[in-house]
């Protein structure tokens, strides 16, 4: 078996059955019974509900010693991709999940793979159903891809699938340019969010939780050309998605002047 990745709580390897290859994810089971039941409840719900062309296909799951194993289709890691294709494919996956009541809570480049011509969402270990509380969330979403409400996390605040949408935007930017839009420690990020909120950039970055696109709104305003036999432009329809897309394309109309990402960092 060839190793694909390894972390503190498990690993992913490539296995072969007949002439086909699959990815086998092994997770070390939690020590306490109440945590184990939460894991099992999550797995049962996902297996019943999360079947979609842009969600990685799971073939079987089982217990083995102190590990929980999931066998799924094998995809290729994504290191560079057209941001519009990521918005379209993973946006569809998130819309499907959100319509079923699930929040992924860990959208980032490492959790997207390519299977054939499709991009697919993987790793549902942090997925939960219904709204969640910031008190219980902690560092669920990786820092570079975390929305402001989880960076601040003041008090007990409920959140829904819109946290995934902010993470999706930053993920798409990263995969297009191989660098994060916002890097650094949490206090630096919060300083930038607060500095630009009053100047209008906050809205263009869709940081305001109430004003942010839902996955449904993104797909309603976003049109991607068919991929068969064409590698040309992937056009957006006109509409509010232009504001969303402008954040990803490298410039903003801010106080009647053009300001790029480098300019943002220079002014901090």
Language model features by range: what are they?
Residues 57-66:
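Short beta-strand micro-motifs within the conserved protein kinase catalytic domain, predominantly
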Residues 86-87:
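Activation segment signature within eukaryotic-like protein kinase domains
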Residues 149-162:
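Conserved end of the kinase activation segment
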Residues 115-143:
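Activation segment/activation loop of eukaryotic-type protein kinase catalytic domains
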Residues 65-78:
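Conserved short submotifs of the Hanks-type protein kinase catalytic core
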Residues 213-253:
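Regulatory extensions flanking the kinase catalytic core
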């Amino acid at each position: 078996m060839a190793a694909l990745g390894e972390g503190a709580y498990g690993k992913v390897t490539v296995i072969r059955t007949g002439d086909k290859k699959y990815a086998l994810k092994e997770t070390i089971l939690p020590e306490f019974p109440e945590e184990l039941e939460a894991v099992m409840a999550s797995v049962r719900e996902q297996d019943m509900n999360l079947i979609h062309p842009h969600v990685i296909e799971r073939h079987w799951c089982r217990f083995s010693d102190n590990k929980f194993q999931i066998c799924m289709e094998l995809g290729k890691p994504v290191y560079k991709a057209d941001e519009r294709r990521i918005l379209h494919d993973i946006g569809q996956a998130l819309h499907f999940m959100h319509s079923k009541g699930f929040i992924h809570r860990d959208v980032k480049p490492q959790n997207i793979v390519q299977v054939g011509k499709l991009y697919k969402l993987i790793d549902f270990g942090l997925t939960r159903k219904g709204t969640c509380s910031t008190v219980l969330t902690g560092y669920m979403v990786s820092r570079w891809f975390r929305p402001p409400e989880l960076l601040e996390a003041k008090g007990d605040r409920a959140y829904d699938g819109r946290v995934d949408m902010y993470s999706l935007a930053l993920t798409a930017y990263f995969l297009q340019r191989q660098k994060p839009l916002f890097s650094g420690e949490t206090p630096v990020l919060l300083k930038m969010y607060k500095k630009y909120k009053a100047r209008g950039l906050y809205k263009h970055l869709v940081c305001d939780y109430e004003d942010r696109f839902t996955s449904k709104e993104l797909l309603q305003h976003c049109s991607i050309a068919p991929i068969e036999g064409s590698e040309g432009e992937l056009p957006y329809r006109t509409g509010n998605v232009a504001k969303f897309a402008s954040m990803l394309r490298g410039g903003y109309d801010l106080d009647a002047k053009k300001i790029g990402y480098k300019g943002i960092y220079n002014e901090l």
